[in-house]
Amino acid sequence: MSTESMIRDVELAEEALSKTAGGSQGSGRCLCLSLFSFFLVAGGTTLFCLLHFGVIGPQREEFPTGYSIISPLAQTLRSSSKTSSNKPVAHVVANLSAQGQLRWLNTYANTLLANSVKLEDNQLVVPTDGLYLIYSQVLFRGQGCPSTHLFLTHTISRIAVSYQTKVNLLSAIKSPCQRETPEGAEAKPWYEPIYQGGVFQLEKGDRLSAEINLPDYLDFAESGQVYFGIIAL
């Protein structure tokens, strides 16, 4: 609908209104409602067209081409994934062929010596000062209980460069047997795992060891059951 047509319709409506001024009150009310409806429809149509073709509308924030909004968490994850860690870390496992003794190896699958950590004389050598998570697990296995008390110990020790004395950092003791297996009774198998872990301030050159008192009871059935490691924090 053009502007001229809209003006013409308004003039005709005014003329009709003047001619019927002396008419009934009901006729006047109908005419007013008709005019109101006409202008309402015309205005709504015009507004729809302006919005549809983008003449008016909400403002949009413009960003340079190729720029994307990334949340702080996403930025952190993305940057951390691109940064390779250079912190010392080690994970060694027991030598399965060394029956009767606990010897650590880093040549099996899923073992690791990274960023200057060394394995020397069955000890892990710390390459730099700092906080370290030290952890170790051993698994004991036996058949029946002897007449004497059976105590199993697992100890993680440190020999510091500042003082050449072995100091226990973590130590645990367990007794798998509460009483002796009666004579003639079936000797049932038992299993006793011991896991230890803690965070310690270490110095470059410190030596760490993980030892037990009764290696004959170690369970070497599966690789990875007995392990020792450190992680720089």
UniProtKB/Swiss-Prot annotation:
PTM per Swiss-Prot/TrEMBL: The soluble form derives from the membrane form by proteolytic processing. The membrane-bound form is further proteolytically processed by SPPL2A or SPPL2B through regulated intramembrane proteolysis producing TNF intracellular domains (ICD1 and ICD2) released in the cytosol and TNF C-domain 1 and C-domain 2 secreted into the extracellular space.
THD domain segment(s): 88-233
Residues carrying a glycan: S80, N95
An individual GO BP term: leukocyte tethering or rolling
Name of this chain's protein: Tumor necrosis factor
Pfam families assigned to the protein according to its UniProt record, in alphabetical order: TNF (PF00229)
Cellular-component GO terms for this entry: external side of plasma membrane; extracellular space; membrane raft; phagocytic cup; recycling endosome
Gene3D superfamilies: 2.60.120.40
Subunit structure and binding partners: Homotrimer. Interacts with SPPL2B.
Topology of the protein relative to the lipid bilayer: Single-pass type II membrane protein
Lineage: superkingdom: Eukaryota
Function (record text): Cytokine that binds to TNFRSF1A/TNFR1 and TNFRSF1B/TNFBR. It is mainly secreted by macrophages and can induce cell death of certain tumor cell lines. It is potent pyrogen causing fever by direct action or by stimulation of interleukin-1 secretion and is implicated in the induction of cachexia, Under certain conditions it can stimulate cell proliferation and induce cell differentiation. Induces insulin resistance in adipocytes via inhibition of insulin-induced IRS1 tyrosine phosphorylation and insulin-induced glucose uptake.
This protein's record includes keyword ATP-binding: no
Site (Cleavage): S34, L35, C49, L50, L51, H52, L77, R78
Lipidation sites (N6-myristoyl lysine): K19
Residues recorded as bearing Phosphoserine in the entry: S2
InterPro entries in the record: TNF, TNF_alpha, TNF_CS, TNF_dom, Tumour_necrosis_fac-like_dom
